[in-house]
């Protein structure tokens, strides 16, 4: 169990640019320039993790594979890679970047047998992204329903999934605060570590998530709040270190 909350600043890549979306919806992006520059800036600011997402791969609108590999390769810190990892080819490409772990999303919902095999083969290098609206999972860039959250959790627990990245889609990119109840419920349903994603808007939000560390929350992905300059990464790291 984590002793303090890990923070994972996010770099989401769409069409070669670092962007942020609202509710994860295509067409709502705000561009923030070079993904490599953004990633290096978070590293310089003291990040121990980077959450790196290929949005084109997630939405099925192409990919930024070469750029993602370049960014991951330039990092001296740990990298969690996400977006469109749903078969042997995309998984091999993701792992070849040297990232610390990969997040499976849609694939986990559409090809459960493959996910079970990958978890068995790669263990701690695999996390499963649980993108939730209510208690329903959403797949493929959040445009399709993918089953019940708790039934899926039960299955993945039994298959030995090492960790979960939990996103409340209703909160993501909105700066409206995290869904603490969802995080508590997921922690109650699994003994694996949970990484929170979506809605962080303030240092108080991060402190509230940090208070869930004893329940099993290990980390928090922070995106729009950092880019919108609601607080600095240094301030965030200090807030959760206490």
Curated annotation (Swiss-Prot):
GO CC field: cytoplasm
Disulfide bonds: none
Catalyzed reaction equations: 1-(5-phospho-beta-D-ribosyl)-5-[(5-phospho-beta-D-ribosylamino)methylideneamino]imidazole-4-carboxamide = 5-[(5-phospho-1-deoxy-D-ribulos-1-ylimino)methylamino]-1-(5-phospho-beta-D-ribosyl)imidazole-4-carboxamide; N-(5-phospho-beta-D-ribosyl)anthranilate = 1-(2-carboxyphenylamino)-1-deoxy-D-ribulose 5-phosphate
Enzyme Commission code(s) on record: 5.3.1.16, 5.3.1.24
Molecular-function GO terms, alphabetical: 1-(5-phosphoribosyl)-5-[(5-phosphoribosylamino)methylideneamino]imidazole-4-carboxamide isomerase activity; phosphoribosylanthranilate isomerase activity
Active site: 12, 131
Biological processes per GO annotation: L-histidine biosynthetic process; L-tryptophan biosynthetic process
Transmembrane intervals: none
Entry keyword set: Amino-acid biosynthesis, Aromatic amino acid biosynthesis, Cytoplasm, Histidine biosynthesis, Isomerase, Tryptophan biosynthesis
Protein location: Cytoplasm
Record pathway: Amino-acid biosynthesis; L-histidine biosynthesis; L-histidine from 5-phospho-alpha-D-ribose 1-diphosphate: step 4/9; Amino-acid biosynthesis; L-tryptophan biosynthesis; L-tryptophan from chorismate: step 3/5
Superkingdom of origin organism: Bacteria
Any Pfam family: His_biosynth
Function (record text): Involved in both the histidine and tryptophan biosynthetic pathways.
Family statement: Belongs to the HisA/HisF family.
Name of protein: Phosphoribosyl isomerase A
Organism: Streptomyces avermitilis (strain ATCC 31267 / DSM 46492 / JCM 5070 / NBRC 14893 / NCIMB 12804 / NRRL 8165 / MA-4680)
Gene: priA
